């Protein structure tokens, strides 16, 4: 029985990796070994950063809320506590969007938080 070398299977597997490595710099888009290593690392980074993105957006929202709160004479923590006491249940994403796009509405929310604290 003749030996099966698997040329088409190997070619397809390598072609798939090389297609994923398109746009990489240097030998990483030309040589299979370098490309497969880089694709592996890139996928590792993509997995890690999909998790990281959530905390980075939360940090951004908190920074925006804090800046807007300080313009209205409150710290971030006092604003959040005041909103909770006032019974205003808004998540940080919504608050950050209001702080960024609609200063008057955010000022009204800050006033409600101040009243609830006093």
Swiss-Prot record:
Keywords: Ribonucleoprotein, Ribosomal protein, RNA-binding, rRNA-binding
Gene Ontology annotations for the cellular component aspect, listed alphabetically: ribonucleoprotein complex; ribosome
Highest taxon listed in the record's lineage: Bacteria
Listed PROSITE patterns: RIBOSOMAL_L20 (PS00937)
Entry's Gene Ontology molecular function annotations: rRNA binding; structural constituent of ribosome
One BP annotation, GO: ribosomal large subunit assembly
Listed SUPFAM superfamilies: Ribosomal protein L20
CDD domains, per database record: Ribosomal_L20
NCBIfam families xref list: rplT_bact (TIGR01032)
Record family assignment: Belongs to the bacterial ribosomal protein bL20 family.
Alphabetical list of PANTHER family matching this protein: 39S RIBOSOMAL PROTEIN L20
Described function: Binds directly to 23S ribosomal RNA and is necessary for the in vitro assembly process of the 50S ribosomal subunit. It is not involved in the protein synthesizing functions of that subunit.
Name of the featured protein: Large ribosomal subunit protein bL20
Organism: Lactobacillus johnsonii (strain CNCM I-12250 / La1 / NCC 533)
């Amino acid at each position: 029985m003749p030996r099966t070398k698997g040329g088409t299977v190997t070619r397809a597997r390598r072609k798939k990796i090389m297609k994923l490595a398109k746009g990489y710099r240097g030998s990483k888009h030309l040589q299979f070994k370098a490309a497969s290593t880089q694709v592996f690392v890139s996928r590792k980074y993509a997995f890690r950063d999909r998790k990281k993105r959530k905390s980075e957006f939360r940090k951004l929202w908190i920074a925006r809320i804090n800046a807007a709160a300080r313009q209205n004479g409150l710290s971030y923590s006092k604003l959040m506590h005041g909103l909770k006491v006032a019974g205003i249940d808004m998540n940080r994403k919504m608050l950050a969007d209001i702080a960024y796009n609609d200063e008057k509405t955010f000022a009204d929310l800050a006033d409600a938080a101040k009243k609830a604290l006093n």
